Amino acid sequence: LKLPSFPIGQIYGLSFNDDNNRIAMTLNSSRSPGDVYVLNIKNKKLTQWTKSEVGGLDTDNFVSPELVRIKSYDDLEISGFLYLPRDKKGPHPVIISIHGGPESQFRPGFSSRFQYWINELGCAVLATNVRGSAGFGKTFVKLDNGFNREKSVKDIGAFLDMIDKDNRLDSNRIGVYGGSYGGYMVLASMTH
């Protein structure tokens, strides 16, 4: 079954209709906090049924991230999502965002905070998935357990190296943000 292209985001809440010829789903993307879409299986047409309220803001100004994959200090592949200001000259200051958990994961979902930083402050945002993040397999999620916790801090160092090599980003203007476990990682990153 060849499907139409979907907006980049998270799909959840799948439900078939009684005749099993349509699938309803919720899509949360970087440009929308959650809308209902229906896919007609016969004609493969995807229809958006709702348009989420975002406080009167123009969602055309919201940006979608690009997936970045890098090698960490020990050649382990780690990833994140890089959000860049639209139509603004760089290099951009960068806010590195570290998720809580540690067994959580950044996905390209809606974040009013990120969109504010990008559109109002002109900052790029790098939402990181260091070792120990969920969604990359059982082995990956255990890579920061116990005495290995410091390895995830070194992953932030690898992202700093990436920023330094990317001419769209200003490696002299970097902030680090996180709450809960992400807050621990902010403090640990700043002391290394």
Residue ranges of model-derived segments:
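Cap/lid segment of the alpha/beta-hydrolase catalytic domain
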Residues: K45, K51-N172, Y177-S180
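Short coil/turn segments at the loop-to-beta-strand junctions that recur within blades
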Residues: F6-I11, E53-L57
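Beta-propeller blade-edge and WD-like acidic-aromatic loop motif
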Residues: L1-K2, N28-W49
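Hydrophobic beta-strand positions that form the internal "hydrophobic ladder"
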Residues: I23-A24
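A flexible loop/linker signature enriched in serine peptidases of the S9 family
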Residues: P7-G9, L27-D35, F106, G132
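Short glycine-enriched nucleophile-adjacent loop
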Residues: G183-H192
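Residue-level detector of Asp-centered blade-edge/turn motifs that repeat once per structural unit
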Residues: D18-D19
